[in-house]
Design a protein with these regions (language model features):
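Rossmann-fold cofactor-recognition segment
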Residues: 61-79
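Conserved NAD(P)H cofactor-binding loop of Rossmann-fold oxidoreductase domains
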Residues: 104-110
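Conserved Rossmann-fold cofactor-binding substructure of NAD(P)-dependent oxidoreductases
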Residues: 76-93
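Canonical Rossmann dinucleotide-binding motif of NAD(H)/NADP(H)-dependent dehydrogenases/reductases
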Residues: 2-41
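Substrate-binding pocket helix/loop in short-chain dehydrogenase/reductase
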Residues: 112-114, 118-123
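Active-site loop of short-chain dehydrogenase/reductase
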Residues: 7, 64-66, 97-98, 144-153
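A short, exposed helix-loop element centered on a Lys and neighboring polar residues
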Residues: 137-138
Length: 153
């Protein structure tokens, strides 16, 4: 432990999802756990504040790091740049730096055939994926440049 001590990572989609068997089913939470084990402070984002709070509680308890949960939903019909700017502002206000941006979150209509996909479902996938990555990279760039940080898409 300690490779990332003093570093800050933003992880989109970092909430804690629980499967029916009680295990954790979120890729973002798995990523958050790996970074927490190495001592990084985390900013985790997602649509469900309760999942983010659950992740915060567990990660802080298990790994002695700081976690900032920020509810953020990048989708069609919202001011996405403002939502992302809010996440980045809170990260800087809380930790003073951003060393890693992990663009993990993306909503999709899993299990729906192409023939049955709606335009709304397609737009959700585009906004929560492609556009979110663009907005986060653009907003984080000045801070990542300063810390010689990294982006993981």
């Amino acid at each position: 432990m300690g490779f990332l001590k003093g570093k800050t990572a933003i992880i989109t989609g970092g909430g804690r999802a629980v499967l029916s068997d009680g295990s954790c089913g979120s890729i973002g939470y798995g990523i958050a756990t790996a970074y927490a084990k190495e001592g990084a402070n985390l900013v985790i984002t997602g649509r469900n504040l309760q999942k983010l709070e659950d992740a915060k509680e567990e990660l802080e308890r298990l790994y002695g790091i700081q976690v900032l949960p920020v509810q953020a939903d990048v989708n069609a019909g919202t001011d996405n740049e403002a939502a992302v700017a809010n996440v980045v502002k809170q990260a800087i206000d809380t930790f003073g730096r951003i060393d890693v941006l992990i663009n993990n979150a993306q909503a999709s209509a899993s299990g729906v055939s192409l023939a049955d996909h709606t335009t709304e479902q397609f737009n959700l996938a585009l906004y929560s994926g492609l556009y979110a990555v663009f907005y986060y990279m653009k907003a984080c760039y000045p801070y990542l440049k300063e810390t010689k940080g990294s982006v993981i898409n």
